[in-house]
């Protein structure tokens, strides 16, 4: 279909992106080629900055999902990838990373158009995806076994082997980086893969699937089934999958886990968050303000680790909040592709309406809201950066994952009170401590119930750093050496001499 872009937006896109968008509607990518979906359902890809459709794709049916899983199973069982020398897998994945780097500008524009985030942020996302892919390419030749002490008539070893067919369901906020958290280690260790991106953001994943074929990844090793919730449900229910990795809401993660229980499929879940940033009076307040702003305004707050709760020493509350609001007013809210934009829209009208509703409920319950900027004069799904003060612990705005540019501020009286507030939600994905005292940083970090604690910084990710949550934020770790356990099985071999 011809992309229905607003003229101002069309002028911001490269000819390569426009050409790619003007192709016929995409369908599933199975066994090395694009297929015509067996479903008649077309899903529009919406530009969040204008509310206009830019292209469409065909939703994958349950039959398409079964075909993708079957292709992945055949590709695994015949060894076309798993039995290749580790050096070959490493070289192929490095070549794939090089191709992604060559097309980084195109993919970043697709990501910004699809998600609504500022182009500068989208470029960082693609850089992260490339870094993760290169990191795990190196792991293909680094997984080793051990010789186990045994009675002298026996030789016993333990070795790591690929699991088999891995599936991933990825979210709309960071489509390509989060796909790479799952796909890169899976392929490095010899597995095959089926990806189901969010129905709202398929463009970068679809582009990447084509790059896999160009890079020489054998047919059937990487498969893509775009679609909405029904497609994801079909994927989790399909026999023949050995591992499912899911990133998304806690509620959907629970559904994935229930479905996986029926087939005893291995699962890892990275779910919601309500991350606290604890600011003590002895902190570098200038740095802390910048850190709090980055933690909540990045990607318009649509981040699983968004630092959406500012827990601050009561003695510095007013001064800190006033300066934070002042700096936030300098942000430019606009279309993600516009050069001056540093805060974009939310991904959909539904997400915008949900965020606005939660803020309205907080106001009705007596909270004070500071709206820090005017909304752009267009049809996009914009919510202005919002600072909520005066909310009580336990209110929805303080407990629920808003997933928007909304910061709730809670004052504390002492360290124990700060920790009580910080740990007082169902979530435990990330947190931060801002303090000039090394002993306090260590002491507080130990007591925070979160998978990641940042101290005097926020949002630092790297391919080597394991990432995941506790409590309702899920289980399992991605990135770093932790992925070895998720994408390999340990085999013990005992030989009688």
Describe each region flagged by the PLM.
Residues 54-143:
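Glycine-rich loop-to-alpha-helix module at the N-terminal edge of alpha/beta enzyme cores
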Residues 51, 89, 111, 133, ...:
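Residue-level signal for inorganic ion chemistry
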Residues 1-49, 75:
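Hydrophobic face of amphipathic alpha-helices that form TPR/SEL1-like repeat modules
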Residues 53-60, 77-81, 168, 277-280, ...:
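Short, well-ordered beta-strand elements within core beta-sheets of diverse protein domains
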């Amino acid at each position: 279909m011809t992309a229905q872009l607003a003229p101002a937006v069309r002028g911001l896109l490269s000819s390569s992106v426009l050409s790619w968008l003007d192709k016929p509607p995409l369908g599933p990518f199975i066994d090395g080629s694009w297929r015509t979906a067996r479903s008649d359902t077309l899903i529009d890809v919406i530009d969040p900055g204008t509310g206009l459709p830019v292209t469409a794709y065909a939703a994958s049916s349950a039959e398409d999902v079964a075909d993708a899983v079957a292709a992945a199973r055949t590709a695994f069982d015949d060894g076309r990838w798993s039995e290749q020398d580790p050096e070959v897998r490493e070289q192929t994945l490095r070549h794939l990373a090089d191709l992604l780097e060559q097309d980084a500008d195109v993919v970043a524009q697709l990501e910004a158009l699809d998600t609504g985030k500022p182009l500068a942020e989208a470029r960082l996302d693609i850089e992260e995806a490339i870094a993760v892919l290169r990191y795990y390419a190196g792991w293909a030749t680094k997984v080793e076994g051990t010789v186990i002490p045994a009675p002298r008539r026996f030789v016993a070893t333990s070795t790591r082997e690929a699991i088999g067919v891995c599936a991933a369901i990825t979210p709309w906020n960071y489509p390509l980086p989060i796909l790479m958290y799952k796909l890169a280690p899976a392929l490095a260790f010899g597995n095959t893969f089926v990806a189901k991106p969010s129905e709202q953001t398929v463009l970068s994943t679809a582009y990447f699937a084509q790059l896999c074929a160009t890079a020489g990844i054998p047919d059937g090793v990487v498969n893509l089934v775009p679609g909405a919730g029904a497609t994801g449900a079909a994927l989790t229910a399909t026999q023949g999958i050995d591992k499912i990795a899911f990133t998304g809401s806690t509620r959907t993660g629970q559904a994935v886990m229930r479905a996986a229980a029926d087939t005893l499929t291995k699962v890892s879940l990275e779910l919601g968050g309500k991350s606290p940033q604890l600011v003590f009076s002895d902190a570098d307040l200038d740095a802390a303000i910048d850190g709090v702003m980055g933690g909540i305004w990045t990607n318009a707050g649509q981040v699983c680790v968004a630092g959406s709760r500012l827990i601050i020493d009561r003695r510095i509350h007013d001064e800190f909040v006033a300066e934070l609001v002042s700096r936030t007013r300098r942000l430019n809210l606009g279309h993600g592709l516009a050069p001056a934009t540093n805060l974009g829209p939310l991904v959909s009208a539904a997400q915008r309406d949900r965020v606005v509703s939660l803020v309205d409920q907080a106001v009705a319950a007596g909270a004070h809201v500071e709206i820090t900027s005017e909304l752009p004069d267009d049809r996009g799904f914009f919510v202005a950066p919002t600072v909520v003060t005066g909310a009580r612990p336990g209110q929805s705005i303080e407990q629920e994952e808003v997933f928007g540019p909304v910061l709730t501020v809670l004052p504390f009286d002492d360290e124990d009170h700060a920790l009580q507030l910080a740990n007082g939600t169902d979530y435990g994905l990330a947190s931060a401590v801002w303090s000039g005292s090394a002993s306090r940083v260590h002491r507080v970090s130990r007591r925070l119930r979160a998978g990641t604690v940042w101290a005097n910084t926020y949002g630092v990710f790297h391919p080597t750093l394991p990432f995941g949550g506790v409590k309702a934020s899920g289980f399992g770790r991605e990135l770093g050496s932790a992925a070895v356990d998720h994408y390999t099985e340990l085999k013990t071999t005992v030989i009688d001499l």
